[in-house]
Amino acid sequence: MKSILLHKHFEKRYAKLSKKIKVAFKERKILFLENMYNPLLGTHALHGKYKGYQSFNVTGDIRVVYKEEEKDIFLFADIGTHPELYS
């Protein structure tokens, strides 16, 4: 069974999101736990400062950055828009 850990930075950004985005995140988190490569998530590996991390889509603009810490244990490191995360 997969487990998710939340980084403090993720928690701070998540707290600032709208209720609508939080609902979308919860739905996508369920998809992630069922199949992290579900096509709706658009999961892909990252490069540069996020080398070793992956990302999935919550909405068209909001993404979650995460990495697998151990087998089936995932650290959600950050959440935000493309410019917030990658600029």
Predicted regions and their residues:
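Enriched for short, Lys/Arg-rich terminal
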Residues: 1-4, 8-23, 58-63, 67-87
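A short, surface-exposed loop/turn module that caps and links secondary-structure elements
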Residues: 31-56
